[in-house]
Amino acid sequence: MTRGRAWGMRRAAAGAGGARAAGPTGGASRLHPNAGRRSGARAGAQGCGGPRVGSADSRALPAQPLACARGRSQRLVCDPKAASALPDLAPDVFVLRVRLEETGEMFRVANCRGDMTVRELKEELDLMVGIPFNLQRLQYLDEGVLMDDTTLKFHDVVPGGIISLCIWHHDGWTELVLAAVEGDPSKLSCLGLTEDSFYRTANSEHFEGEKWKHWTSQRAFVALYVASHRGHFDAVQYLLEHGASCLSRSPLGRTPLHVAAAMGRSDCIILLLQHGASIHDRDAKGETPISIAHRLNHTLSERQMVLLHRIAKSGIRDLNDLVMKNALQRVKSGFRSEKMTMTPH
């Protein structure tokens, strides 16, 4: 063998040996599944101190998409532009329903707001339900009493939700209010509305003199207030004839004429005006019976009060007069003229 040929054979052998040595490095994981595990063990033996290479990589790689997804979700919520595009599901003004628990009646209250206080709601219910402000007890869901200075939002009251209205049970108020709601004079007569009544509660058992008089007059006023709101003509007439004052006021400064006007109770309005009620009395909000009737679109009641006030100013006192009857009939039938000519007999 010549020297050149032998040199060529040695070069070929060296190239083949290098290829074999490089083969395991590039293809060990494919040809030998346990190669990675063995290399991990060797790395641990050399003092790397970490977990196996295969297991660590398998946990770390899937975590990246989750982190990205979490980041994307946070950007959707926190990005001001994205948040402004989301619809506001809570309306600024909404409707509530209020159930008077003692009677089961349901009342619809419009124009409620999240920042509306419980006191403001009770002021509206004073007109709508006819229960004086100080006798109302409101509850929602958990049966806890709603405090006056809290808001509807504070109690998580939702649009269309039902709020329970209860009457305070102390001092016999529940029985009195229910009798006035029913409008039965015979029941009212037994519930301590006059000074000669034998009706007593645990609170009033020892009342005498002015204290007893004040207690009975207060109860007579509440009965008149509720009966006027409900339009019970016979009950209103009975109460007025037995000393109930149509000039007394509720804690909100309202008279029975205020609530009668709020409900458009024409017959009761006339009866109250006959007994000296004023259309110009203002409540704590500055509203008169006429302005309340106007705000609540009770046009007929508004006209009646204006007409009766003008007739009273003209000096006519007997409302049973024929001219008065004709005038009232024209108002009830929808007569729209603000001027009337009074012809002498």
From Swiss-Prot:
Region (Disordered): 1-57
Recorded superkingdom: Eukaryota
Name of the gene: ANKRD60
Name of the protein in its database record: Ankyrin repeat domain-containing protein 60
UniProt key word Repeat: yes
Keyword Repeat among UniProt keywords: yes
UniProt xrefs under PROSITE patterns: ANK_REP_REGION, ANK_REPEAT, UBIQUITIN_2
Keywords in alphabetical order: ANK repeat, Repeat
